[in-house]
Amino acid sequence: MNGPGLGQMSLFPPEPAPEPLLCWLWLAHTLGAGSGHAGQVLDAFGGAQEAWEARESDAFRAAAGIPAAQRARLPGNTPEHYRAFARRCAARGIRILPYDDPDYPLAFSRIPDMPLVLYCTGDPRWLNEPATIGMVGSRKPTEYGQQAAAD
């Protein structure tokens, strides 16, 4: 029988790429709020999906500033873990704006370590208007603050 040997073919289809929004949520959670490494990761990889694909590399770990103690958690933390969270946000009328979204505020993109995702209600185009009002949350909330935000 002619054809490729078993070493040349895969018995399983290639794993599909995760949805871009889920990759942004994964990257934002992996780096953590206020990590100071968002700009380095985007400079090195271009976007969240590319960072996901490079997650096992030393280059990703260096750009992300992930200490050795935290490296073990990366393989189990996949973009798919954020699907239910994204659905809950959508059900509550909360829009998730990743860094590459056209409605992401231009002023935020100029911050050296910008938030990788923003959560908003209403029309996000107002965020690019000269006079805006925003609600700012803590990068290190108290337990009470976390519970209040969840409710």
Where in this protein do the model-derived segments appear?
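Short, positively charged patches
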Residues: 2-151
